[in-house]
Amino acid sequence: MQDLKQTIETAFENRGELSPASAPAAVREAVEQALAMLDRGEARVAEKRDGDWVVNEWLKKAVLLSFRLNDNEIIRGGATNFFDKVPLKFADTNSEQMRASGVRVVPPAMARRGAYIGPGAVLMPSYVNIGAYVDEGTMVDTWATVGSCAQIGKNVHLSGGVGIGGVLEPLQAAPTIIEDNCFIGARSEVVEGVIVEEGAVISMGVYIGQSTKIYNRETGEVTYGRVPKGAVVVPGSLPAKDGSHSLYCAVIIKQVDAQTRSKVGINELLRP
């Protein structure tokens, strides 16, 4: 693993000299191996160690290098064709392999190779980008998008039209992370490396980036970049000091209770 990491780190330092025609075989093989590990869930761009999220920068670099090393090519896809550098995850998968994976994929859902989809996950017509990690039992609902290298936990529900930000463009230091058992309401956006901690519930139409104020109405505290464990969050606004206008914010209105959980619980009938 250390040799693989070093090969990718060195190649990234010299990425300006690389092209599909000129890339050394060792670099190409290293990037391919890293992407295969991401695809199988054997490696993650970010992982929790001793309670803290740690970013594996070298894997993010491998994802970026793959765009340098590969030409666009025709990708066959049902009723149409595509022209891209990254093949589709399930393009060469047969029915036995899909059954073994425990994943359900509803047309025309798309996942790029290099994304991991865990057992029991359901992809409604949605999009999962390269380097993303979608853990077991998670529902990615219709028109939801999981950005490059985003980390989605177990038994998460990403409702219709949800956007989870990626790291590739604009280039972000850390991926967006949705921890286990979270519910993200329809048309909400969580981007720029924001962390939504375990069991949180984000209401419909909430937008959270690193500069978004997260206001706790019980304590009056304003925080940024992280939604606390078990918080229930709705869209709101905070007035300017001079009272001339208000600006958007996300508001923590309470902690998840039994009533909230009953409304956002996982429906096992919909799982594979």
UniProtKB/Swiss-Prot annotation:
One of its GO terms (biological process) is lysine biosynthetic process via diaminopimelate. Pathway: Amino-acid biosynthesis; L-lysine biosynthesis via DAP pathway; LL-2,6-diaminopimelate from (S)-tetrahydrodipicolinate (succinylase route): step 1/3. Substrate binds at residues 104, 141. GO terms for molecular function: 2,3,4,5-tetrahydropyridine-2,6-dicarboxylate N-succinyltransferase activity; nucleotidyltransferase activity. The keyword Acyltransferase applies. Its EC number is 2.3.1.117. GO terms for cellular component: cytoplasm. Homotrimer. It is found in: Cytoplasm. This is 2,3,4,5-tetrahydropyridine-2,6-dicarboxylate N-succinyltransferase. It comes from the Bacteria. The keyword Membrane does not apply. It catalyses: (S)-2,3,4,5-tetrahydrodipicolinate + succinyl-CoA + H2O = (S)-2-succinylamino-6-oxoheptanedioate + CoA. Belongs to the transferase hexapeptide repeat family. Keywords: Acyltransferase, Amino-acid biosynthesis, Cytoplasm, Diaminopimelate biosynthesis, Lysine biosynthesis, Repeat, Transferase. HAMAP family: DapD. It is an enzyme of class 2 (transferase).
